[in-house]
C-alpha cells in the first residue's frame, strides 16, 4: 500500500536526480541480449557504484541508540515475510521488471505527480510486466532496465489504454546506474521513500544462479514516521512519533542469528541481510521483504523466512534524519 504525502518545505539545496546523469555503460556490464527479457538475469552485474549506499557493507556499522524502540514499533514477534514467489491470486507474485536494449523505442508517458517525476519518454515495451498483472490493482509498478545505457526507469500505478503506444502512471523516476546521484530532496519516486525499487529486490538470478546477493534489500512497515534519512528522499506519513521508523531506515540481521538450519537459497538471502541489511522503502505490511516473481522459485523454501523475527534485527545508526514540520 502506497500513500504519497508531499513535504511542505523542500530542502533549499537539491541533489541532482539520477535521471539527469549519463554515465554510459560500465565495464563488465552484461550484454543486452534479446530485445526484452522479463525478470532476466544481470549475470552478476550490480547496479550503482561500489561505494553507493545500496552496495555498502554495514555488518560492522554501529547500532542506532533507539534501535530497540524502533523495532518494537514495527513488531518484535512478527516474522519476515517473502512478498514474492511464483504465483499469488492468479498473478506473478512480486514486483516484476524487464531488461531492454538500446533498440527499445521510447514512448510518451504522463504522471499524476509530474512535478516530482522525471519526464518521458520511457523505453517501456508494450508487453512490459505490471505488478499484480495487467488487470490487477495494487501498486502496479513497472520497472525497465536499459542494459546498454545502464539506466533504470521506474513507474508506480502504471497503465496503458492503447496497447503500449503511451503510458500513464502516478509517478516516475529515472536512475543512472553508474552514478551515486539521489533524487532531489523531498521528491518521491516509484517508491514512497524516493528510492529506486529494483536494486532492493530479491531476484532469482542472484539467489540461485549467482548464489550471492551483494546489495541491500527493501521491505515495508505498516506505520512510518513523517521523516526520511538518506538515501531516502521522501516521507509518506503524517505521524511525527520518534518511535516510528523514518523512510530509509536500515536494519540488519544480527550477526549471532543462526541460519545454518535454513534452506540453502534462503541462507543466501539471510547472509545478505547480515552484510547489507534492508531499507524501509514503503508503507505496507510489516516485515514484508520485496522480491521479483519467478516461476522457478520454491515457495515452500521461501516460506521458511518467517522463522526470522523482528527481534532478530537491529537498526543501523542513523544521522541527518529529515523530519517534517
Would you name each region that the model predicts?
Residues 14-16:
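C-terminal motif of bacterial Sec signal peptides marking the signal peptidase cleavage site
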Residues 28-325:
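Short, surface-exposed polybasic-aromatic patches that bind anionic ligands, especially phosphate groups
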Residues 18-21:
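Bacterial signal peptide processing site
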Residues 1-4:
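Positively charged n-region of N-terminal signal peptides that target proteins for export
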Amino acid at each position: 500500500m502506497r500513500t504519497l504525502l508531499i513535504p511542505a518545505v523542500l530542502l533549499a539545496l537539491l541533489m541532482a536526480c539520477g535521471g539527469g546523469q549519463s554515465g554510459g555503460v560500465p565495464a563488465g556490464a552484461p550484454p543486452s541480449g534479446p530485445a526484452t527479457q522479463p525478470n532476466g538475469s544481470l549475470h552478476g552485474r550490480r547496479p550503482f557504484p561500489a561505494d553507493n549506499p545500496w552496495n555498502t557493507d554495514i555488518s560492522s556499522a554501529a547500532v542506532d541508540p533507539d534501535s530497540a524502540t524502533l523495532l518494537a514499533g514495527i513488531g518484535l514477534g512478527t516474522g519476515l515475510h517473502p512478498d514474492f514467489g511464483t504465483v499469488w491470486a492468479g498473478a506473478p507474485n512480486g514486483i516484476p521488471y524487464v531488461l531492454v536494449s538500446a533498440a527499445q523505442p521510447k514512448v510518451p508517458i504522463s504522471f499524476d505527480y509530474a512535478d516530482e517525476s522525471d519526464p518521458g519518454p520511457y523505453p517501456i515495451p508494450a508487453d512490459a510486466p505490471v505488478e499484480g498483472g495487467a488487470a490487477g490493482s495494487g501498486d502496479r509498478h513497472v520497472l525497465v532496465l536499459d542494459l546498454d545505457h545502464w539506466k533504470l526507469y521506474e513507474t508506480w500505478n502504471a497503465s496503458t489504454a492503447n496497447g503500449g503506444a503511451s503510458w500513464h502512471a502516478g509517478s516516475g523516476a529515472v536512475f543512472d546506474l553508474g552514478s551515486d546521484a539521489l533524487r532531489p530532496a523531498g521528491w518521491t519516486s516509484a517508491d514512497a521513500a524516493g528510492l529506486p525499487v529494483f536494486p532492493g529486490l530479491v531476484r532469482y538470478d542472484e539467489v540461485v544462479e549467482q548464489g550471492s546477493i551483494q546489495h541491500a534489500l527493501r521491505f515495508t512497515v505498516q506505520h512510518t514516521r513523517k521523516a526520511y534519512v538518506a538515501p531516502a528522499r521522501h516521507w509518506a506519513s503524517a505521524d511525527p512519533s520518534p518511535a516510528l521508523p523514518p523512510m530509509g531506515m536500515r536494519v540488519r540481521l544480527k550477526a549471532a542469528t543462526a541460519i545454518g538450519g535454513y534452506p540453502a537459497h534462503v541462507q543466501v538471502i539471510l547472509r545478505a541481510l547480515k552484510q547489507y541489511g534492508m531499507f524501509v522503502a514503503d508503507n505496507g505490511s510489516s516485515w514484508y521483504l520485496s522480491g521479483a516473481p519467478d516461476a522457478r522459485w520454491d515457495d515452500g523454501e521461501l516460506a521458511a523466512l518467517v522463522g526470522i523475527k523482528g527481534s532478530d534485527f537491529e537498526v543501523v545508526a542513523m544521522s541527518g534524519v529529515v523530519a517534517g514540520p
